[in-house]
């Protein structure tokens, strides 16, 4: 239960075996390759051109082409997925994810059948887009010309007249209708109304051939807009034709949509191909991290110590003596670069989420997750503390884990909350609370033992702070910073223990013997901080540093006060739940089992959500500030081995 021990791994092999080796390493997913050109021992050889990257110009061009293929396939997947028949959420969660062995995925991808698939699907999508565009254009034309349906002549026909000319268009419709009246009164114009609306009138306007310029100027002055219509058919016939085209194109759309909706197999093929391309791309990009001569290639990376023997056997079986493998222990100068892989048992592993939310530990730090799991388990349960809420959370998450096919990260989250549900139920037993109802077997009553709960909260805080300070001291001992180990860690553990003994001796009868022990324990270690500060600084100015350190006692008091939220949130959740029950009890007997039952479910669902949210946030806050602040630095980088892509496909072993 700790940070997994790592080793540096070096491989030397013939250049001809590079692709095969990278493929083998990817299938095993045990090595994180690092960039040799960034390491001092290799930089001189790179600068002298003794070594180069095995990624040739042809490889670079192939990588660019590979990235284009990835983009095309991913774009088609995203385009095609919305056309698939919509599945119910629960049904989708129950379905097995796509899976394939790594060897089968490689065999599938090497066929490179995405070209045919993409061509076929692009053609279908073009047909669909074209049909939809035709429908949109036709509907736009119908909307524009529908008001002209009664028109029995076209602009083209009017242009063939010899003795009279005509214009077709609209004039504004105003409240006074002065424009229409003025045009109708004009002696040289003959107006035939086609339609009228709230905003305009549609007219065919006839005039003598020789008056064209004068008439056009007159009409423009009156806001006349000529109809844009070039068809030889009258609008009624043209509109009927457009409606027929819409029906034809809607049939095309329906047929094409049916084809696309039946393309689940093609979509799955694209997903297989996408993960193949991503895996291939990862291997090609890994070549830029290596070093090579004309005939040999060198590769270095990180591997978990526990995996070295199995990898050695695997390479021996696949490559024999053609691959030279060496491992080296991690040195102090490597600490900042070593990737971090946490290894914990099934009960502790879900709480890695809390640690990772803050930061992974550095390689020289201990994994705090085992202790975090204990504290967070207690804190969360104490802040929610209801048997019903806890059982519901555990049963719901357990059902989801048992029934649904979930991604590893999602399953880990659900296991986390399932364990927290147990804590909530246990603390519910302590407080005797079941959906806000007070049970007869309460060990501590939230209504009459508030002071007991407050003291318990402070005690938990005191223990948390002491453990954090002790771990901080141990960390500095490992780093051989003994001054800081005492001043910021062990001394404060003893001072706080002394203050605790002093308080207990004064409060509890018959415990007065603890008073002098606690007093001198605190005084001697306070003096010890001053002495160690002066000695370590080798001058009297260290006294100021020591005094400032002693001033931190106010900060520890603040830490203990912060833990009173364990009481506050626990009592508030119980009080709100109890108040909701009182509201439901106000209903008459029949109403309690109808509207009252529904109200009970809704109100407790709200209280449950807010209680879980508060427990999650404030529990994390207590861990991050009051606990991690005493010893934990963090900042580690996650272990990311070369492994198969699993964006869409689960790789089977």
State what each model feature region is.
Residues 1-372, 400, 407, 414:
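Long, charged N-terminal accessory/stalk domains
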Residues 2-7, 14-30, 309-653:
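Conserved, carboxylate-rich catalytic/transport cores that coordinate ions
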């Amino acid at each position: 239960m700790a940070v997994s021990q790592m080793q540096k791994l070096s491989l030397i092999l013939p250049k001809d075996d590079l692709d095969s080796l990278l493929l083998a390493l990817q299938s095993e997913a045990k090595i994180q390759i690092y960039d040799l050109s960034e390491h001092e021992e290799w930089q001189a050889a790179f600068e002298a051109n003794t070594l180069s990257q095995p990624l040739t110009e042809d490889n670079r061009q192939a990588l660019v082409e590979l990235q284009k293929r990835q983009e095309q396939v991913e774009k088609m997947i995203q385009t095609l997925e919305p056309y698939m028949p919509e599945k119910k959420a629960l049904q989708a969660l129950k379905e097995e994810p796509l899976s394939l062995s790594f060897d089968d995925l490689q065999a599938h991808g090497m066929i490179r059948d995405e070209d045919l698939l993409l061509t076929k699907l692009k053609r279908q999508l073009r047909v669909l887009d074209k049909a939809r565009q035709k429908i949109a254009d036709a509907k736009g034309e119908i909307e524009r010309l529908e008001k002209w349906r009664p028109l029995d002549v076209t602009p083209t026909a009017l242009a063939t007249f010899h003795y009279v000319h005509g214009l077709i268009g609209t004039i504004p419709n105003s409240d006074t209708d002065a424009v229409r009246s003025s045009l109708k009164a004009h002696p040289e114009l003959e107006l035939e109304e086609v339609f009228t609306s709230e905003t305009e009138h549609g007219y065919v306007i006839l005039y003598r051939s020789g008056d064209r310029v004068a008439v056009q100027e007159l009409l423009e002055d009156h806001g006349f807009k000529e109809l844009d219509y070039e068809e030889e058919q009258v609008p009624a016939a043209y509109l009927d034709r457009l409606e027929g085209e819409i029906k034809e194109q809607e049939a095309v759309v329906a047929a094409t949509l049916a084809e696309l909706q039946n393309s689940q197999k093609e979509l799955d093929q694209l997903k297989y191909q996408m993960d193949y391309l991503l895996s291939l791309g990862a291997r090609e990009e890994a070549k830029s991290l290596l070093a090579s001569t004309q005939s040999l290639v060198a590769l270095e990376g990180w591997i978990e110590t526990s995996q070295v023997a199995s990898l050695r056997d695997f390479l021996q079986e696949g490559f024999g003596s053609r691959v030279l493998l060496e491992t080296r222990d991690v040195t102090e100068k490597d600490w900042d670069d070593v990737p971090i892989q946490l290894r914990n048992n099934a009960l502790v592993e879900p709480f890695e989420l809390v640690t990772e939310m803050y930061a992974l530990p550095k390689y020289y730090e201990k994994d705090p997750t085992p202790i975090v799991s204990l504290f967070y388990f207690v804190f969360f349960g104490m802040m929610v503390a209801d048997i019903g809420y806890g059982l519901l959370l555990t049963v719901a998450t357990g059902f989801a884990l048992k029934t649904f096919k979930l991604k590893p990260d999602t399953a880990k989250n659900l296991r986390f909350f399932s364990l927290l549900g147990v804590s909530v139920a246990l603390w519910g037993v302590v407080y005797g609370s079941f959906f806000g109802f007070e049970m007869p077997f309460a060990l501590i009553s939230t209504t009459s033992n508030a002071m007991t709960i407050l003291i318990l909260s402070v005690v938990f805080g005191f223990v948390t702070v002491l453990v954090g300070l002790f771990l901080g001291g141990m960390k500095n001992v490992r780093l051989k910073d003994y001054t800081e180990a005492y001043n910021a860690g062990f001394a404060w553990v003893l001072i706080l223990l002394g203050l605790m003994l002093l308080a207990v001796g004064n409060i509890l009868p018959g415990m007065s013997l603890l008073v002098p022990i606690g007093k001198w324990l605190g005084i001697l270690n306070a003096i010890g901080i001053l002495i160690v500060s002066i000695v370590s600084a080798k001058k009297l100015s260290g006294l100021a540093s020591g005094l400032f350190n002693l001033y931190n006692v106010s900060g520890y008091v603040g830490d203990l006060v912060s833990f009173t939220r364990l009481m506050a949130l626990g009592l508030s959740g119980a009080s709100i739940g109890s108040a909701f029950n009182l509201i439901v009890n106000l209903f008459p007997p029949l109403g309690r089992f109808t509207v009252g039952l529904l109200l009970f479910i809704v109100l407790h669902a709200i209280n449950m959500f807010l209680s879980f949210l508060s427990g999650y946030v404030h529990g994390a806050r207590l861990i991050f500030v009051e606990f991690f602040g005493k010893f934990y630095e963090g900042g580690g980088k996650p272990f990311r081995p070369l492994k198969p892509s699993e964006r869409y496909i689960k790789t089977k072993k």
